[in-house]
Design a protein with these regions (language model features):
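A short glycine/serine-rich beta->alpha loop
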Residues: 10-11, 41-49, 85-90, 194
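Beta-strand segments within the central parallel beta-sheet cores of soluble alpha/beta enzyme folds
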Residues: 34-40, 71-83, 221-226
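Glycine-rich, charge-dense phosphate/pyrophosphate-binding loop(s)
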Residues: 103-106, 114-117, 180-282
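Single conserved hydrophobic/aromatic residue that forms the stacking wall/gate
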Residues: 1-5, 9, 280-286
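DPxDG-like acidic metal-binding loop motif
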Residues: 49-69
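Glycine- and acidic-rich phosphate- and metal-coordinating loops
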Residues: 22-44
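ATP-dependent small-molecule kinase catalytic core of the GHMP/sugar-kinase superfamily
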Residues: 65-214
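Phosphate-handling active-site elements
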Residues: 27-35, 63-77, 282
Length: 286
């Protein structure tokens, strides 16, 4: 699959991202100006592959090079890109996609202070272990799924607020489980399940990073498997409940598990609900 197109000034989506990045750069005190650009990309649009984040970062990097002597660092470009998507594109995304695109490679990010995120590169020599990272296009897209995405942080914050905090990361998981009945009664079961995913995922991420840093690839795969299962069962971002008859990702995951067996792991990729799956496959599976 390959897509080529010349950016059109009448394309409101593209224009909103460009204008948002330029406004953000200007507000941060950087010089801005015009430029002509032609883009060729293999990134699937609306499939959970950070296509909008990648585009925002490209625009920011172009302006950094043309007008600011390439002095705008990758973290600031990511933050400005997020601003463009939140304010101009009207999508309530976090900072993860933009940061991954801007910094590059596999990264571990701590977002406790969004103004000063802690970013650490993680080694990713998959070929060393005879494994490949694959993306499976399930032929769905993210059109009209903004509300589904927005409900995830909204529901998690309901649980955090019940426990007296703004964010789940500041909550005591032991208190959460002790008061589970109260929380279920107050906010409902889906927010509770999504909170359980959050607490699980904090451990999964730490285990995945530690495993890669210490060359324990089997443990890394186990962390990815647990993360994917938690996303499906507790975060519930594999399909939209507004269209239960179309579950492309669910079917793709079922088939992938059946085909891979012990030769790899799979999980939903990106924001979920539609789009792509992520697979780590053993070269021996060929």
């Amino acid at each position: 699959y390959r897509r080529q197109r010349q950016m059109c000034i009448r394309d409101s989506t593209t224009v909103s991202l460009i204008r948002g990045v330029l406004r953000g750069l200007k507000d941060h005190g950087y010089k801005i100006g015009g430029f002509n650009a032609y883009a060729t990309s293999d990134v699937l649009v609306g499939a959970g592959l950070s296509s909008s984040a990648a585009f925002e970062v490209v625009v920011g990097t172009i302006i950094s090079g043309l007008y600011n002597d390439m002095k705008i660092n990758s973290v600031e470009i990511a933050q400005i890109s997020q601003y463009a998507e939140n304010v101009f594109f009207k999508k309530p995304c976090g900072l993860m996609d933009q940061m991954a695109c801007s910094v590059g490679g596999m990264v571990n990010i701590d977002f406790k202070d969004p103004t000063k995120p802690i970013v650490k590169k993680v080694p990713t020599e998959f070929e060393k272990y005879d494994y490949s990272l694959c993306i499976v296009d399930t032929k769905g897209d993210h059109v009209d799924l903004t509300d589904d995405y927005a409900m995830i942080p909204s529901e998690m914050k309901k649980v955090a607020n019940f426990l007296g905090e703004d964010y789940l990361r500041d909550c005591d998981s032991n208190e959460f489980y002790i008061r589970l009945d109260e929380i279920r009664e107050a906010v409902g079961d889906r927010p509770v399940l999504r909170a359980i995913h959050f607490f699980n995922e904090e451990h999964n991420v730490k285990n995945a990073v530690s495993s890669l840093e210490n060359g324990k690839f089997v443990e890394f795969l186990d962390a990815i498997r647990k993360s994917g299962n938690s996303s499906f069962k507790y975060l519930q971002n594999v399909y939209t409940t507004r269209d239960i008859q179309h579950q492309n990702i669910s079917v793709a995951l079922a088939l992938s598990e059946s085909l891979l067996r012990n030769y790899g792991v799979c999980r939903v990729h990106g924001g979920g609900f539609a789009g792509t799956c992520l697979l780590y496959t053993s070269d021996a599976a060929d």
